[in-house]
Structure formats: structure tokens, C-alpha cells
């Protein structure tokens, strides 16, 4: 795939020539960044459950800015550091979560986040539940991190331990502007943060692939949850959820080849110079029962009709799922009678296809040595 044999020969030779076969970069790879402009209102404060999920379940690599509850409310050092965080995120496009240490419960004790009985802010770098390092306003050598409003001191210290992420949150408008104006070649992953399939695909498929491959271009993520919630509440301000799915060509009615049904998540698209040229849909298969009681996939993005158009699928043996028989024990039926393919079993077929898409469109080719 894309001359992988040649890549395998080039990579070690090139890396040795560029860095003299020095010690491998041991910095961690931050998981998420953002291209969405931030301000004090948009800073993401996580609660105990959210922090536990990021550290223990999703094994995310992240930056955590910590304040001390009521001790910090009227403190200039914390209000200054909030400005630092905003400027840092807007300049470096790296997500920073905010957390109140005074609300910490026993479930998070292994993170070793310090509670102070004063206003001193802190900054932590976590790789899952492992604390990579921490900085505190209490240490004179760390104070610049919390006082340099431009975020340059924070950048210098953070990047000694962490590399920039490869997954960046963007707005739907970012994608639409690229289609109409900028015409860049980009990969875009559509999710909803409340979607179970999306919670599965990122930590179990996308992130492990990125962490094990150092030749991946950035992937942009659009979280459609807010638009989905507004539509369900009957609020019509702005562009409705269904309308944005059509404009993004997620629906089959807007793009017969690369759209699927009414538009589903998780879906990843590839835009070649602003034009949608391929896509991959994770899960979202329809399961039906035959007259003899057996089950099969009655609808899937991976059909015979699409096979000639989805270029990455030819590298995967099981690339047509529509019409495939599945075992009865692999089917889950809800209390309302809805049937679906279990995540564990479906992932054996969907994960290779999704990762093949990433490898085909997001891996970059090392430049040839023409000297």
C-alpha cells in the first residue's frame, strides 16, 4: 500500500542521516488540538467523571490546568493564568482542560493531583493515568508559565515533554469554507460526543493507529453534538442539524456515492483540493432477520455498489459487508426490539477498513533523495 516496502527501507536510513541515530524522541503525543477560537467562556472545565474517563478509559494524553476552587476565585494569579491558557490554545492549537482540585474525589487519587489550601494554580501533563510531569505557581522556576500571557513560557516547558497533536477539532464552517474557498486536501472525522460508536472509534481505532505510526498527517474532527441537541429541542436558530449534514455531504441524498442513509457518525471523509473524493463509515450497519431465524447485514456503507469508488477498501479482504450473514450470538436486541451488531464483533470488520482509510489518505510519503 503506497509503496510500504519502500517506506520501510527509507525510514530508518533517513532518520539515521537526519539525527545521527540519536536517542528516540521520548516525548508523548498530545491527543487533541483545536482550531476553534477560544475565549474565557469556552474554556472546557472537566468534572470528576469526565476526567476519570479521559485518564482511565480513553487513555488520552492531555494538558490539565488546575485551580483551587474558592481559594482561586479572587486571585490574580488564577485570572492571569486563564488568559495564558486562552492565548496558548489559540496560538498553539492544543487543548487544555481546566479542573477544580477541591472537587477531587477518591476515584482520581491515582492521578496525584495536589490540593492546596491557597490559590496556587498548577499545570499537569497526563498520559492516561500516568502523570508525565507537573508545574506549579509555588515553584519559582515555574512561575513564568503562569504569568507570561502570550503563552510562550508555557509552550517552551510543555514541548519539552509533549509533541503537538494530530487530531484537531474544527467547526462545520471550517469544512464548508475549505470546500468553497480554500480547496485544501484534508481528512475530516465527524462525531457526536454523546454517540457510543464515536466513543468507541477514537480510543480503540483512530488513536492507537496514530500512536503507532509517526507518518500521519493531521485529521480534523467536527463534533456535531450541539447541533444535534438543538434540533432535538426544536430550536431552529442557525443551521439545523439535518441541513448541515446535507451541506457536508454526509447524507445519501446529498452524495449518492459517499453519503450514507440520513448521514451518520462516525464518518470520515477525504477532500481532495476541496472536493469530496472518498469516505469511510464506522459501524451503523442495519441488521435484519431471515425467515429461518438467522441474521444478516441488510444495509451497510460497504456494499458492492460502492466498492469501486472507495479506493482504500481494496486492501482489505472483507470489504463488502452488505448481505453478509452474522451469527445469532453476535446480535444484540434492545428492549424496544431494535437489533444491532455487537461492537466487539463488528469492530473486527470495521476497524481494518477505517484504519485502511487513514493509512491511504493521511499517511505522508517521505521525500525521495534526489541528490
Range-by-range predicted roles:
Residues 16-20:
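C-terminal motif of bacterial Sec signal peptides marking the signal peptidase cleavage site
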Residues 1-5:
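Positively charged n-region of N-terminal signal peptides that target proteins for export
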Residues 239-261, 271-273:
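Short, internal strand/loop/helix patches
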Residues 38, 47-94, 174-222:
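Local sequence-structure signature of Cys/Sec-based thiol-disulfide redox active-site neighborhoods
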Residues 22-24:
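Bacterial signal peptide processing site
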Residues 45, 67, 93-108, 190, ...:
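Thiol-based oxidoreductase modules, predominantly thioredoxin-like and allied folds used
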Residues 124-163, 258-370:
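Non-catalytic, surface beta->alpha helical segment in thiol-disulfide oxidoreductase systems
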Residues 121-122, 192-200, 264-269:
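C-type cytochrome heme c attachment motif
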Amino acid at each position: 500500500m503506497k509503496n510500504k516496502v519502500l517506506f520501510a527501507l527509507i525510514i530508518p536510513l533517513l532518520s539515521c542521516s537526519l539525527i545521527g541515530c540519536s536517542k528516540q524522541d521520548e516525548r508523548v503525543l498530545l491527543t487533541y488540538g483545536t482550531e476553534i477560537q477560544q475565549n474565557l467562556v469556552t474554556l472546557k472545565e472537566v468534572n470528576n467523571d469526565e476526567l476519570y474517563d479521559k485518564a482511565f478509559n480513553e487513555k488520552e494524553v492531555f494538558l490539565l490546568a488546575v485551580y483551587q476552587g474558592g481559594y482561586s476565585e479572587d486571585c490574580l494569579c488564577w485570572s492571569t493564568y486563564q488568559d495564558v491558557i486562552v492565548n496558548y490554545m489559540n496560538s498553539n492549537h492544543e487543548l487544555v482542560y481546566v479542573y477544580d482540585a477541591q472537587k477531587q474525589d477518591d476515584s482520581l487519587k491515582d492521578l496525584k493531583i495536589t490540593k492546596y489550601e491557597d490559590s496556587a494554580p498548577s499545570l499537569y501533563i497526563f498520559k492516561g493515568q500516568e502523570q508525565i510531569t507537573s508545574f506549579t505557581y509555588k515553584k519559582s522556576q515555574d512561575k513564568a508559565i503562569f504569568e507570561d500571557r502570550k503563552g510562550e513560557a508555557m509552550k517552551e516547558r510543555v514541548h519539552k515533554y509533549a509533541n503537538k497533536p494530530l487530531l484537531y477539532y474544527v467547526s462545520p464552517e471550517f469544512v464548508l469554507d475549505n470546500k468553497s474557498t480554500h480547496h485544501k486536501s484534508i481528512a475530516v472525522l465527524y462525531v457526536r460526543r454523546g454517540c457510543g460508536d464515536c466513543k468507541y472509534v477514537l480510543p480503540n481505532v483512530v488513536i492507537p493507529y496514530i500512536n503507532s505510526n509517526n507518518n500521519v498527517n493531521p485529521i480534523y474532527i467536527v463534533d456535531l453534538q450541539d447541533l444535534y441537541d438543538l434540533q432535538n429541542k426544536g430550536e431552529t436558530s442557525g443551521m439545523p442539524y439535518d441541513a448541515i449534514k446535507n451541506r457536508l455531504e454526509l447524507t445519501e441524498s446529498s452524495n449518492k456515492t459517499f453519503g450514507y442513509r440520513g448521514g451518520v457518525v462516525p464518518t470520515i471523509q477525504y477532500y481532495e483540493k476541496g472536493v469530496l473524493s472518498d469516505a469511510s463509515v464506522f459501524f451503523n450497519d442495519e441488521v435484519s432477520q431471515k425467515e429461518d431465524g438467522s441474521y444478516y447485514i441488510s444495509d451497510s456503507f460497504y456494499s458492492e455498489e460502492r466498492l469501486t469508488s472507495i479506493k482504500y477498501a481494496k486492501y482489505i479482504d472483507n470489504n463488502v459487508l452488505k448481505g453478509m450473514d452474522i451469527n445469532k450470538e453476535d446480535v444484540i436486541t434492545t428492549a424496544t426490539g431494535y437489533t444491532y451488531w455487537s461492537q466487539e464483533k463488528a469492530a473486527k470488520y470495521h476497524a481494518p477498513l477505517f484504519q485502511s482509510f487513514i493509512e491511504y489518505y493521511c499517511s505522508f510519503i517521505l521525500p525521495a533523495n534526489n541528490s
